[in-house]
Amino acid sequence: MNEETQNAAAQQETGAQFTIQRIYTKDVSFETPNSPAIFQKEWTPEVKLDLDTRSNKLDEGVFEVVLALTVTASIGEETAFLCEIQQAGIFTIADVEETQLAHMLGAFCPNVLFPYAREAVSNLVNRGTFPQLNLAPVNFDALFAQYMQQRTAQAEQASVDA
């Protein structure tokens, strides 16, 4: 049984539907606020990665998911570069339970988008003539589980305080 047949069989059994309609760059920014002086310094940067995800319901079973990355490279107190990417996708997700939908929007879809965002960051850093930057993989499943634990703890704390 080939992979397409297996996927079709799995979808028929569960009734769940998942389709990538489109992946696109929603917003991009690259800044080198301390150039050209920063190019004269020894390249020993501290690289910081911030990421965030959000989703919007566009239609019944159609969602936009946006993965926002901010990469900041600093040498001492000076910012070498600041790169911001919003990588987005439009996904069809139907016939799934609410908890499964939340996981797909908060972890599965960002996993799909991350390689595109990572490539965009790498290309922008390269065009800025900085040494190559390859972002490490991100475990969105673990981040989503941590987020859900925080929400549960906050809800429990709110009920205790009430």
From Swiss-Prot:
InterPro entries: SecB, SecB-like_sf
Compartments it resides in: Cytoplasm
GO biological process: protein folding; protein tetramerization; protein transport
Cellular component annotations (GO), alphabetically ordered: cytoplasm
NCBIfam families: PRK05751.1-4, secB
PANTHER family listed in its UniProt record: PROTEIN-EXPORT PROTEIN SECB, PTHR36918
Name of the protein this chain belongs to: Protein-export protein SecB
Source organism phylogeny: Bacteria, Pseudomonadati, Pseudomonadota, Gammaproteobacteria, Alteromonadales
